[in-house]
Curated annotation (Swiss-Prot):
Keywords: ATP-binding, Carbohydrate metabolism, Kinase, Magnesium, Metal-binding, Multifunctional enzyme, Nucleotide-binding, Serine/threonine-protein kinase, Transferase. It comes from Staphylococcus haemolyticus (strain JCSC1435). Mg(2+) binds at residues 158, 200. One of its GO terms (biological process) is regulation of carbohydrate metabolic process. Residues 199-208 are annotated as: Important for the catalytic mechanism of both phosphorylation and dephosphorylation. Its cofactor is Mg(2+). This is HPr kinase/phosphorylase. InterPro entries: HPr(Ser)_kin/Pase, Hpr_kin/Pase_C, Hpr_kin/Pase_Hpr_N, P-loop_NTPase, Ser_kin/Pase_Hpr-like_N_sf.
């Protein structure tokens, strides 16, 4: 659970008062700048958000009659408000200090510009409050593409990852991949701390990839873009031989491209994954070889059809 205390510590912010409220949970990634509230309109006040007070808000507040000031700040400091932050190194008004102490609302000061701090807070909150899950598989950075290798236990995922690392690519996680959905369409994979940098090879045991291959062979996190699912070759199954069939894998609320690779002796799976990653990069650049081939094939069929009619 993310608390105001953790926010202050990780972002190196300065607590001015309200230390009794540091245990308050932060559940919302949105940040509010209470401009209308400064004018007295609290009908739709988002009290569960972090409140940012900058030059604009405090300049308007200073224009208010003395008899309205304390009541205005008292309404701003609610029991569910995780924190109020005064930016640009401004001095918090005494009425705000009194209200924060009365309601145990953490009052934080920062020298950062309001928009700059809002950007930092949003990025931090989206990361900390992101939806999470974990998957059995291996995550490897192949030519800059985060490739999640999945498949049944014993299919050869870790051995394939080892071959990819030997070929200059980078391991992120083996066996268990922790995944955060930072924003929609952005999945970040990380390794569990216990098995970070480690790779399990059956018959060999656990190896430390960073020790064996150097710091350039590992990453601590990577955006997942492509799923390669390994399965034993089924002679009765029709596998995609052209590349027109688009499979996807849904993780949380995000779908990523999925490719199923049949495994059997003689197939170099690591090379196939390298080509799949390069082909994925071409696809997002707008170059689709399968569609180009299909278009040429259709044109050739139409051409021969016209020739047959003419004859």
């Amino acid at each position: 659970m993310l608390t105001t205390e953790k926010l202050v510590k990780l972002l190196k912010l300065e607590l001015f008062t309200g230390e009794k409220g540091l245990h308050k949970p932060i559940k919302n990634t949105d940040i509010s700048r209470p401009g209308l509230e400064m004018a007295g309109y609290f009908s739709h006040y988002a009290a569960d958000r972090i409140q940012l007070l900058g030059t604009t808000e405090l300049s308007f507040y200073n224009l208010l009659p003395d008899e309205e000031r304390h009541g205005r700040m008292r309404k701003l400091c609610r029991p569910e408000t995780p924190a109020i932050i005064v930016t640009r190194g401004l001095e918090p008004p005494q009425e705000l200090i009194d209200a924060a102490q009365e309601m145990d609302t953490p009052l934080i000061v920062s020298k950062d510009a309001t928009t700059s701090l809002m950007s930092r807070l949003t990025t931090f909150l989206e990361h900390e409050l992101a939806k999470t899950t974990s998957l059995h598989g291996v995550l490897v950075d192949v030519y800059g593409v985060g490739v999640l290798i999945t498949g049944d236990s014993g299919i050869g995922k870790s051995e394939t990852a080892l071959e990819l690392v030997k070929r200059g690519h980078r391991l992120v996680a083996d066996d268990n991949v922790e995944i955060r959905e930072i924003t929609k369409d952005e999945l970040i994979g990380t390794p569990p701390k216990l098995i970070e940098h480690l790779l399990e090879i059956r018959g060999l045991g656990i190896i430390n990839v960073m020790t064996l291959f150097g710091a350039g062979s590992i990453l601590t996190q990577k955006q997942i873009r492509l799923n390669i699912n390994l399965e034993n070759w089924d002679k009765d199954k029709l596998y995609d031989r052209v590349g027109l069939n688009e499979e996807t894998l849904q993780i949380l609320d995000t779908e990523i491209t999925k490719k199923t690779i049949p495994v059997r002796p003689g197939r170099n799976v690591a090379v196939i994954i390298e080509v799949a990653a390069m082909n994925y990069r071409l696809n997002i650049m707008g170059i689709n070889t399968a569609e180009e081939f299909n278009q040429r094939l259709n044109e050739e069929i139409l051409k021969k059809g016209h020739q047959s009619k003419e004859n």
